[in-house]
């Protein structure tokens, strides 16, 4: 499994759980489970950070990002105070877009595609087992767009 796919999968699972809880969708519970409406309901929960299905194969060729009209490279974003500690982010390779001849065309712009994800941040810092949920904006790829042209009259 590629680093990007592994991080994406674990964050998608975490986001799904948070969405279910926030939406108030009932998940079957044992009769002894506390009610979330109870003011004594804990604000802290225990989470198993082991990722299921780590061996899921990647489904794209390794040169995928280089074949776009707006190619990118992946850069490692590492933060030991965050889970996942490594997030791979895209960086656009050109300011323009690549035409059919493989040349950069500056009549189009290569721009980053960003996605907000949820990560777990250690809190307080350096505590191995204490985290809080945090939103992070990451660049997941690049795309080609027409430039914004402003005419001065």
UniProtKB/Swiss-Prot annotation:
The keyword Signal applies. Glycans are attached at residue 53. Highly expressed in adult heart, skin, and intestinal tissues, such as jejunum and ileum. Its main location: secreted. Residues 1-23 form the signal peptide. It holds the Pfam family IL17. It is found in: Secreted. GO terms for molecular function: cytokine activity. InterPro entries: Cystine-knot_cytokine, IL-17_chr, IL-17_fam. Disulfide bonds join 92-142, 97-144. One of its GO terms (cellular component) is extracellular space. Keywords: Adaptive immunity, Cytokine, Disulfide bond, Glycoprotein, Immunity, Inflammatory response, Innate immunity, Secreted, Signal. It comes from the Eukaryota. GO terms for biological process: adaptive immune response; inflammatory response; innate immune response. Transmembrane segments: none annotated. Belongs to the IL-17 family. Homodimer. Forms complexes with IL17RA and IL17RC receptors with 2:1 binding stoichiometry: two receptor chains for one interleukin molecule. IL17A homodimer preferentially drives the formation of IL17RA-IL17RC heterodimeric receptor complex. IL17A homodimer adopts an asymmetrical ternary structure with one IL17RA molecule, allowing for high affinity interactions of one IL17A monomer with one IL17RA molecule (via D1 and D2 domains), while disfavoring binding of a second IL17RA molecule on the other IL17A monomer. Heterodimer with IL17F. Effector cytokine of innate and adaptive immune system involved in antimicrobial host defense and maintenance of tissue integrity. Signals via IL17RA-IL17RC heterodimeric receptor complex, triggering homotypic interaction of IL17RA and IL17RC chains with TRAF3IP2 adapter. This leads to downstream TRAF6-mediated activation of NF-kappa-B and MAPkinase pathways ultimately resulting in transcriptional activation of cytokines, chemokines, antimicrobial peptides and matrix metalloproteinases, with potential strong immune inflammation. This is Interleukin-17A. It comes from Sus scrofa (Pig). The gene is IL17A.
């Amino acid at each position: 499994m590629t680093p990007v796919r592994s991080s994406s999968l674990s964050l998608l699972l975490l986001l799904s759980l948070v969405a279910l809880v926030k939406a108030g969708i009932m998940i079957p519970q044992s009769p002894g489970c506390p009610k979330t409406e109870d003011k004594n309901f804990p604000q802290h929960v225990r989470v198993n950070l082991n990722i299921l299905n780590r061996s899921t194969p990647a489904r794209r060729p390794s040169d995928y990002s280089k074949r776009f009209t707006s190619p990118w490279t992946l850069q490692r974003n590492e933060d030991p105070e965050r889970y996942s500690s490594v997030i791979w982010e895209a960086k656009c390779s050109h300011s323009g877009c690549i035409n059919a001849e493989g040349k950069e065309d500056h009549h189009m712009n290569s721009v980053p595609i960003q996605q907000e994800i949820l990560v777990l941040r250690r809190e307080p810092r350096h505590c191995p087992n204490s985290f809080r949920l945090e939103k992070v904006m990451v660049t997941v790829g690049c795309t080609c767009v027409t430039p914004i042209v402003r005419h001065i009259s």
